[in-house]
Amino acid sequence: MGAIETIEKYIRKIYHRNKVPPRVKAKAVLLYHWGIALRKVEKFIKALGLRGSREAIRQWYHRLSELIELVLESSQQLYVDETKIRGRRRLYYLWLAVDKEGKPCFAYLSRRRDTWTTKIVLSSSRGRKITTDKGWWYKRACRELGLEWRHETFGGRNAVERAFLLIKHRLKGFYKRFPWNAKFETISSFLRAFIFLYYTLEGLS
């Protein structure tokens, strides 16, 4: 099953009524995911003689965030990292963990980066062995949660860094329209949809 067919299958899980054919929605979602502007994706849909506004396309994409649990794995050994995401007049933090095979185990957007937030992130992961960078918030949180903590500069964390690079590259494509002008919930929804699609498509390759 190819990328379009796979995403079409998931579109059908979310939308039971479709004025726009699910396959067209799947193509539109993939174009947007790969960095094509909403304006151009809208023109693509209209060229097919169908109606699909920019806002509708954006909503199709964000609805896929509901399916992120389908790509998340469970593992005792986690490689965890976080990166800064600039939102409306402030910074947020995207946390991502993968297992030893590079498969995602959790993704979480927070307003803070401290021991308290790290404990929330790690306690929801169910992992027992945590490998991170030297961030003090990890070591302290692992100690308080009774988790085994290890520092590693490269290794398993490379898979997380690759995902972050792609996310940052995609966000740069918005120039200054998003996520700098967006609310926390909107940014979180977009990132969860992106991560779902990224790992779904990676699994097809």
Spans of features found by a protein language model:
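Residue-level recognition of single "structural anchor" positions
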Residues: 1-205
